[in-house]
Curated annotation (Swiss-Prot):
The gene is IL15. GO terms for cellular component: extracellular space. GO terms for biological process: immune response; interleukin-15-mediated signaling pathway; neutrophil activation; positive regulation of cytokine production; positive regulation of immune response; positive regulation of peptidyl-tyrosine phosphorylation; positive regulation of phagocytosis; positive regulation of T cell proliferation. It is found in: Secreted. The keyword Secreted applies. Belongs to the IL-15/IL-21 family. This is Interleukin-15. Disulfide bonds join 83-133, 90-136. SUPFAM superfamilies: 4-helical cytokines. GO terms for molecular function: cytokine activity; cytokine receptor binding. It comes from Ailuropoda melanoleuca (Giant panda). Pfam families: IL15. Keywords: Cytokine, Disulfide bond, Glycoprotein, Secreted, Signal. It comes from the Eukaryota.
Length: 162
């Protein structure tokens, strides 16, 4: 399975150390490379953009229309901004249901990519504890079209606050 990781990078200090320790890199240029490498390793990584999550939601919507999936999923239709992380986690759990119930390669790959991107973005919020929010099972079950529309709305809440 190929997971797309747009805008993600990682820097390894070991590579720069290896280059520096080789005798022919003990020059002024080699030292500059080492210092710049150390500085870039300390910079925060660029995270996936919520726009890629919306793109994957649109792709899922197109796939669902083409293979005529008719299912109901727990859907948060009017999430309060203070409960957006909880709502997002519920949406991601319900996406796993789609992936497990429907054996469609492109659909499953897109769902997994979307889950990866959203979880990566959520991890930047740390361990936020939201109180007074509905549990996933307390949400109303709606058809998949309404589920995806509500999902886009939640993602837009994240975009508007970042």
């Amino acid at each position: 399975m190929r997971i797309l990781k747009p805008h993600l990078r990682s820097t390894s200090i070991q590579c720069y150390l290896c280059l520096l320790l080789n005798s022919h890199f003990l020059t002024e240029a080699g030292i500059h490379v080492f210092i710049l490498g150390c500085i870039s390793a300390g910079l925060p990584k660029t995270e996936a953009n919520w726009q890629f999550v919306i793109r994957d939601l649109e792709k899922i919507d197109n796939i669902i229309q083409s293979i005529h999936i008719d299912t109901t999923l727990y859907t948060e239709s009017d999430a309060h901004p203070s409960c957006k992380v909880t709502a997002m986690k519920c949406f991601l759990l319900e996406l796993r249901v789609i992936s497990l119930e429907f054996k469609h390669h492109v659909l499953n790959e897109t769902v997994e990519n979307l889950i990866f991107l959203a979880n990566d973005r959520l991890s930047s919020n740390g361990d936020i504890t939201e109180t007074g929010c509905k549990e996933c099972e307390e949400l109303e079950e709606k058809n998949i079209k309404e589920f995806l529309q509500s999902f886009v709305h939640i993602v837009q809440m994240f975009i508007n606050t970042s």
